[in-house]
């Protein structure tokens, strides 16, 4: 054991990976629906490892923190700038005011309780579950004209206050928005009914949905032998597909075997005759039912031997950006292609007829390879799997953002700046937006983005925990149980105020009120709780714009809270 401790002291990088290993493991454990979460677990494990008196030198903490902030900005950049358009301004304005609540309430409570700068910053970070504030506030504290000892004391108390308030910040937010929120809107049944009403309005019904599919309802391809008298002396492919459409089934003829010859690319004017074998594609429940009408299903490996493709496509074409899904699916190039999924700022949004597709959205298409490829060219940029990250783009973005953040102005002799961390966030926002406009460069594959986001943040948190370890216990004794109660108030008051503001001032649809509030607070866990409570995915429609704004402003509040104190 002594040998292991010695090695961790000599090689502190191993202590960091020990912290990550144990922290991620504990963070995945759930007791019922409760989990500490990875970030809190990594912090607490880092504190325990820090009791071994391990010193982590060098800029490793800052390097990973900048990577994390750039990744955050990169993800939400397209949606952040889209919110500046007229139709996004109400949600953007709501999110900005909500974020002010999230700053002012912790600040007022910190003043009332007599907290110092570090305690106030930790209260903000934990109660609003915005871990990046730890680093941003720390950078700002280091620029203050105070003694090095005071700076160290403030920086060491931030993770203590964060850990005490984060648990209710996460679990409490889910409870306020998922349980209390519907009551504030007139009751759970009323909100459920409002969600169903919005779904119906947006096209979530059997008659309007045959062109769409959920992940649980995959596109399938089946072969049938034509036997129905309806075909008579022959029917064109377009006649058959129109017949399906009239019966609320969006099915397509993909291949035909006629007189023993396989026709691989079938034109709309191709004539189908009794005895032909046809391959139909579409939602599984519709395709399977055609055995009773067309004729018997046949097992023809040769006829069914063709590539089908699932392809994510970034929407960039002006001709489709801003259009409803129902409009896009009616376009000629969407023949044979279904939309399985839409992701916006990394969040899945409902695929409904009236859902508007924005530039920068990632739309997942399903169909035969040649039809999907043709549709992808008309929608935007095919985001094909790759293991290459454009590190020129990443490095340049962080460099430019960091240099901008390093610029400072002096007010009353106090230097004020975004800091390099705030600058990296701004750089990520701009470069993420730029990538959505010009997707031929700046590619960061989703797994790589996950690494930058999750490993970047948790590597930073691990070092913070290890550094704070020796003083953590004493700091916890000083803040005590009272900080937990103050944190609960700092979490709950802005959320309740946000719900009431969204309902009475902004007059959002009840289905969107809770999603907008969750987005402004960037609490994805609460969004899941809301959707589970109201039994609908529609709250996600209010989440993405407010999430982009909240993720930006709440991080910048790490600078502001220090200056206010």
UniProtKB/Swiss-Prot annotation:
Transmembrane segments: 14-34, 36-56, 92-112, 117-137, 157-177, 391-411, 414-434, 448-468, 481-501, 508-530, 545-565
Disulphide connectivity of cysteines: none
Keyword field: Cell membrane, Membrane, Transmembrane, Transmembrane helix, Transport
GO CC annotation: plasma membrane
Main location: membrane
Pfam family, one: Asp-Al_Ex
PANTHER family associated with the record: K(+)_H(+) ANTIPORTER SUBUNIT KHTT, PTHR30445:SF9
The protein, known as: Uncharacterized transporter BF1518
Source taxonomy: Bacteria, Pseudomonadati, Bacteroidota, Bacteroidia, Bacteroidales
